[in-house]
From Swiss-Prot:
Pathway: Amino-acid degradation; L-arginine degradation via AST pathway; L-glutamate and succinate from L-arginine: step 5/5. PANTHER family: ASPARTOACYLASE, SUCCINYLGLUTAMATE DESUCCINYLASE. Transforms N(2)-succinylglutamate into succinate and glutamate. Its cofactor is Zn(2+). GO terms for biological process: arginine catabolic process to glutamate; arginine catabolic process to succinate. Zn(2+) binds at H63, E66, H155. The active site is at E219. The keyword DNA-binding does not apply. It comes from Vibrio campbellii (strain ATCC BAA-1116). Signal peptide: none annotated. This is Succinylglutamate desuccinylase. Pfam families: AstE_AspA_cat (PF24827), AstE_AspA_hybrid (PF04952).
């Protein structure tokens, strides 16, 4: 048996800052190649790799305290090593911010998932990580066809949600809402997908905007520490992710996800800013048309559509930052294989 790349496992070694992580390679008995580039970055290459092979980035830990995806990824990599998990897609597994994970913190100095645009940012630990991740994505997608590129950036929500799992589809200049991607969400029993209406600065947006990748930010349950996650609630997602890696069809029934469009983004403009609901309000809490739910200066914040719902509310953001997204359910259809709505 070939000696493992890991002393214990991909996740455990990544979080053990007392050991050095040097670049290394391993070829398994089934011909699958593992390439460890640095702490928390592992490429997996199938024995047969062609121009049609999917090139899939599976990232987690962009927010260090969102650990359920790390545990799922660690289990998949163990099964790849043992030969139990079939590999037909080329994959790049990333645990993005180990130092933040060890601190049980979302981030240390700045929100990493807001640093993937081309704007100037103050130097921070997170900015250095973002710059490294951009290069990893560039190198991974080099000489690949755009239609083979996927990026699933896996997170957990910091608040309760009316949808235990949901995804955010970035808005880009490329067709990145393919039927195959939505079929994956349905197979994974992801309850809802939120269709962004403007560019952002997230990791998944970066891959979609710059490389045309089928990319999603995926919210998988609630924040918890390693070992305390309820992974049973993510079984369908785990199976579908494994099927994606194996390029095999699901054996379980799909569940169509609810589609939401972003109706508007609430940006904090004044020091005198507040919501009328508690900090622990659930994502996707809805309001009736005209209902006031906060204020920004002397301007009331109110629902402009019936059943308009709030997602990612944060009354504590700095002036000029996004304080919430407002979303509405929307009917969708496919045009030329792409999900669209009127």
């Amino acid at each position: 048996m070939t000696k493992s790349l890991f002393r214990q496992s991909f996740l455990t070694d990544t979080l053990d800052v007392h050991i050095d992580v040097a670049p290394a390679e391993q070829v398994l008995s089934n011909g699958v190649k593992l390439k460890l580039y640095q702490r928390g970055v592992l490429e997996v290459i199938p024995e047969e790799y062609t121009q049609e092979t999917k090139n899939v980035i599976i990232s987690c830990g962009v927010h260090g305290d969102e650990t359920a995806p790390m545990e799922l990824v660690d289990s998949i990599i163990k099964d790849i090593e043992s030969g139990f998990q079939k590999v037909e897609a080329r994959c790049l597994f990333i645990i993005a911010h180990p130092e933040s994970t060890l601190a049980h913190s979302r981030f240390l100095e700045e929100n990493l998932n807001r640093l993937f645009d081309e704007k100037e940012h103050e130097p921070t630990k997170e900015l250095a990580i973002a710059d490294t991740l951009k290069l990893l994505v560039r190198d991974f997608y080099q000489d690949t066809a755009a239609e083979t590129r996927w990026h699933l950036d896996l997170h957990c929500a910091i608040r309760a949600s009316k949808h235990y799992t949901f995804a955010v589809s970035p808005k880009t200049r490329h067709p990145v809402r393919s039927k195959a991607l939505i079929d994956f969400l349905d197979s994974a029993h992801i309850e809802a997908v939120l269709l962004s209406n403007s560019p952002t600065s997230t990791f998944s947006w970066f891959s979609a905007e710059n490389y045309g990748a089928q990319a999603l930010t995926m919210e998988l349950g609630r924040v918890a520490r390693i070992g305390e996650n309820d992974l049973d609630k993510l079984t369908a997602f785990d199976l579908s992710l494994r099927n994606l890696i194996a390029e095999s069809k699901a054996e379980h029934l799909s569940k169509p996800c609810i589609k939401y469009r972003v109706s508007r983004t609430i940006v904090r403009l004044h020091e005198d800013f507040d919501f009328m609901f508690d900090d622990n309000v659930e994502n996707f809490t809805s309001f009736v048309h005209g209902e006031v739910f906060g204020h920004d200066g002397d301007k009331p914040l109110m629902a402009k559509n019936d059943n308009e719902a709030v997602v990612f509310p944060n009354r504590h953001v700095a002036i000029g930052q996004r304080a919430a997204l407002m979303v509405c359910e929307v009917k969708t259809r496919y045009e030329d294989g792409e999900l669209v709505y009127d």
